[in-house]
Amino acid sequence: MSFVDQASPKNEIKFEQKPLIKSLQDLNIVESWKDGKLKSTTFYHVTENEEVFFGYTSKNKRETSIPEFNSALQRVQDQDIYPTIPADTHLTLAPEGLSASSVYVKRPGLQWYEEMIGTDYLPKAVLDETMVMEQISQSPHENIIRYYGCRVRRGYITSIVLERLDQTLSQYVTTSDFQELDKVKFFESLKSAVEHLHTLGLAHNDINPDNIMVKNGSPVLIDFDSCQPFGKRLQSLGTEGWYEEVFYTSEKKHDIYSLEKLQEWLQAAK
């Protein structure tokens, strides 16, 4: 396992040349609609060196040609989306050469980039989740997603690398395997993971079926971008329908409520 100390973004390598997009598969594309009409199409491309190119158009993706996509792409400055490493911080570097099929590389929420330009929302979100995963990795739990480490490029934390699992609980309940599930054991395993977080002084704050993966019939808790120490102010709230009331700080009671609701949901699922 490798560690990295604080690095300075001053020693940056030169940016890569603007990428040549050859097909829509080279892009992540989000179409924004309102009242049945297209507002805009945003798209981005991430290079192998974690450089991000972003663009938008008023056309839908089917009406936009590959040359038009290429022309619209502009380099996003690292500091707009990635955090630098805080002083006196030791980070676990994800091993190079991990199979792409076995890991999930979690990057900043670039679908929010255009809306959040000029704020520190995206860099802070990456840093917060990285530091939480570092803390959890020092006291791992079998029902919490495995953290391999983060990636650092040009002095910035560009992504975190996690175990890849294929099925959320929302998806799992629609399969025949769900009929054989020991719901009591499943829930107790999930509860154990949440209680483990609480012993670390952390609340997840967003427990719902889409943030629980299923591995060999057991739950694995994921998505720690709202997980913070008790009492800390949050940037993002829980998922609508899974919290008792709107909240702005991290609290154990949010998890307790969500667990109770999830237990009811699990028992009702057929």
Where does each model-flagged region fall?
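Long, solvent-exposed N-terminal ectodomains/accessory regions
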Residues: S2-S71
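Charged catalytic carboxylate motif
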Residues: D128, S189, S258
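Conserved structural core of kinase catalytic domains
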Residues: Y104, G109-L127, E134-S137, N143-F186
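ATP-binding glycine-rich loop module of kinase domains
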Residues: Y44-Q138
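Conserved alphaE helix
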Residues: D182-H196
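Catalytic-loop of the protein kinase fold
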Residues: H198-K215
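C-lobe/activation-segment region of protein kinase-like
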Residues: T42, K215-K270
